[in-house]
Curated annotation (Swiss-Prot):
Source organism superkingdom: Eukaryota
Disruption phenotype: In knockout animals, the eye lens grows normally, but during lens differentiation, denucleation is impaired and the degradation of mitochondria and endoplasmic reticulum is suppressed.
UniProt name for this protein: Heat shock factor protein 4
Organism of origin: Danio rerio (Zebrafish)
Tissues expressed in: Predominantly expressed in the eye.
Designated gene of the protein: hsf4
Pfam family of the protein (one): Vert_HS_TF
Swiss-Prot/TrEMBL keywords: Activator, DNA-binding, Nucleus, Stress response, Transcription, Transcription regulation
Length: 441
């Protein structure tokens, strides 16, 4: 028979699958040389160890790598050996002999084959603790994974929030820039509107050429200007004024004049500085003299008022005023009556400010013609006109276009002074403000 490599012979016998500690313990107990320190009991179910000190020093080193009795006892306990307590040892009196007895169910004298049934104890508590630890570890790992996933989600959310915050800050910056630009634009618009309002105010833009009244006694003042009057281009070009006679020789010495009556002349474009100078001169002349309306008699009411003013008392003009014949002819031919129709045909000119005198100038020619018609009876009393013309027809039905130019001039010299004098007195009693024209914007 072949020997089992795991078997060890014990006293001529063999045992298989027996731990080395049990084999050494069986040899140690069976050795008769060590019976004084370790031996079987009388029954053969246990063994005794005497004098543990000597046994640890003399016997243990021969079979084991240590000489510690506590380690030997611990190994016995690992294989299921138990300590047997005697009645003598349990008493209060210490026994005279140091004797320790150990026993096991399968460690019997003469039954070596039972050693195979002796197994090393496995700690059940340790296995349970190990299982608990593994469960805890798995739970811990799961919780760690959950925490990691939550942390990743939080990081992603934080990243999104950072991006959104950056976008919001950019939008805020752009909105601030737009707001500042809008504020600048609004400030510019407000400044522009205020400048336009100030420029359109009467104190700034309304400073037009307000010439003095040519038919004034020095006491009346021009009325306030009006805004947004529509006037045609023709009415601006055909402006006329009536100037009172003056006795100043320096201003009228070179002009050829006609004795008697005021001067009616066309007004061209005059700069603002010259208009202001004329206004100041006219105001000074009003303070110095009275107005001369008519030298020769025209009508009873007008004659009485004109005779009280001497001709040489005024310093404005030294010679009688001049009445242009072409002007009188245009009045007689009815140009003033067609002036409204021509205004309607011409494009309208929007004027921000026009003095009140301009409106009176627009209607001055028509008023003159009406005055001429109203004073037809006074003109019939004129002897020079009665000798040359027949007044069977009304004045508005006369055909001045077919009349001889010489007759027209004589008629004008005879009729106009009386009509103009009456017209001037009516303008003083009412609110007639002739003007010297104005410059276009």
């Amino acid at each position: 028979m072949q020997e089992n490599p795991g078997s060890i012979g014990v006293d001529g016998g063999y045992a298989s699958n027996v731990p080395a500690f049990l084999t050494k313990l069986w040899t140690l107990v069976e050795d008769p040389e060590t019976n004084h320190l370790i031996c079987w009991s009388a029954t053969g179910t246990s063994f005794h160890v005497f004098d543990q000190g000597r046994f640890a020093k003399e016997v243990l080193p021969k079979y084991f790598k240590h000489n510690n009795m506590a380690s030997f006892v611990r190994q016995l306990n690992m294989y299921g050996f138990r300590k047997v307590v005697n009645i003598e040892q349990s008493g209060l009196v210490k026994p005279e002999r140091d004797d320790t007895e150990f026993q096991h169910l399968y460690f019997l004298q003469g039954h070596e084959h039972l050693l195979e049934h002796i197994k090393r104890k496995v700690s059940i508590v340790k296995s349970e603790e190990t299982k608990v630890r593994q469960e805890d570890l798995s739970k811990l790992l799961y919780e760690v994974q959950v925490l990691r996933s939550q942390q990743e989600n939080m990081e992603m959310q934080m990243q999104d929030m950072k991006q959104q915050n950056d976008v919001l800050w950019r939008e805020v910056v752009s909105l601030r820039q737009n707001h500042t630009q809008q504020q600048k634009v609004m400030n510019k618009l407000i400044q522009f509107l205020f400048s336009q309002m100030q420029s359109n105010s009467p104190s700034t833009v309304g400073m037009k050429r307000k010439l003095p009244l040519m038919l004034d006694d020095g006491c009346s003042t021009p009325p306030a200007s009006k805004f947004s009057h529509n006037h045609s281009m023709e009415s601006l070009q055909e402006s006329f004024y009536i100037q009172s006679p003056s006795t100043e020789s320096a201003s009228c010495s070179t002009s050829s004049v006609m004795t008697g009556g005021p001067i009616i002349s066309d007004v061209t474009e005059i700069p603002q500085s010259s208009s202001m100078a004329l206004q100041m001169q006219a105001e000074e002349s009003r303070e110095k003299c009275l107005m001369l309306i008519k030298e020769e008699p025209v009508s009873p009411g007008v004659q009485g008022r004109a005779e009280g003013v001497p001709l040489g008392s005024c310093e404005v003009c030294a010679e009688p005023p001049v009445l242009p014949v072409a002007m009188v002819q245009s009045v007689l031919e009815g140009r003033g009556s067609n002036l409204g129709e021509r205004r309607a045909k011409r494009p309208m000119l929007e004027r921000p400010e026009i003095p009140d005198g301009v409106e009176n100038v627009d209607m001055s020619l028509e008023d003159l013609q009406l005055l001429l018609r109203s004073h037809q009876q006074s003109m019939e009393n004129n002897a020079a006109a009665m000798d040359q013309f027949t007044f069977s027809l009304p004045l508005n039905e006369w055909n001045f276009a077919e009349m001889d130019p010489n007759l027209k001039s004589e008629l004008a010299n005879a009729l106009i002074p009386a009509a103009v004098s009456q017209y001037m007195f009516q303008g003083q009693e009412g609110e007639l403000y002739p003007t010297a024209g104005y410059e276009e914007q």
